[in-house]
Amino acid sequence: MGDEEKRKMEEKERKKAEVRKRLEEAAKAKKAGGKRGFMTPERKKKLRNLLRKKAAEELKKEQERKAEQRRKIIAERIGQPKPLDNCNEATLVGILKQYHARIAQLEDAKYDLEYEVRQKDFVINELTIQVNDLRGKFVKPALKKVSKFDKLKMVVKSTSEVDFRSSLKSVKKDAFKLDEENKADKKPEWALGSKKENEE
């Protein structure tokens, strides 16, 4: 243990000396070069390249991991292929029935999952509407996009069709009738009275 501790101490001292030496060199360079920033353009370029390489490697690893995971899941779900080479007709029919049952089961599960997703989407939509109502924010309807050329065509079309009657105020025809005409249309009270008596 004594030798090992000595070796560790020497290693620490050596590292400290290296760090001290680097700091001294940096201080000398700073004094000699005036005010130069730590990140010189070359260092920035190197750092950028290193970051790009690292990001590309991580992306590649992630893609490989996802592809491997996908292969495992597919192999697990599909299972081993059935030997079809030396099979008679009865075994082939049995294998086909197994595959058919498996497909039906998977379609059933798929339908259930799709139904569940639709239900949850509906619930999410309802909850968002409630939240917006509570906040006082309302869903703005999507506006129909109209190009400026279509808009101009519509304006030109509306101005080209001149309709003078559309600008006139509409008037009720009954306002200008005389009261006498209204009275002439009405039946006398004695005629109405006899009808009322008959109804009773």
UniProtKB/Swiss-Prot annotation:
Residues 1-20, 181-200 are annotated as: Disordered. Pfam families: Troponin. One of its GO terms (biological process) is muscle contraction. Expressed in salivary gland, gut, muscle and cuticle (at protein level). It comes from the Eukaryota. Residues 2-116 form a coiled coil. Disulfide bonds: none annotated. Keywords: Coiled coil. One of its GO terms (cellular component) is troponin complex. The keyword Zinc does not apply. Rabbits immunized against the protein show higher resistance to tick infestation; feeding on immunized animals results in longer feeding duration for larval and adult ticks, lower engorgement rates for larval ticks and reduction in egg weights for adult ticks. Belongs to the troponin I family. Inhibits endothelial cell proliferation and angiogenesis in a vertebrate host. Probably required for efficient blood feeding on vertebrate hosts. This is Troponin I-like protein.
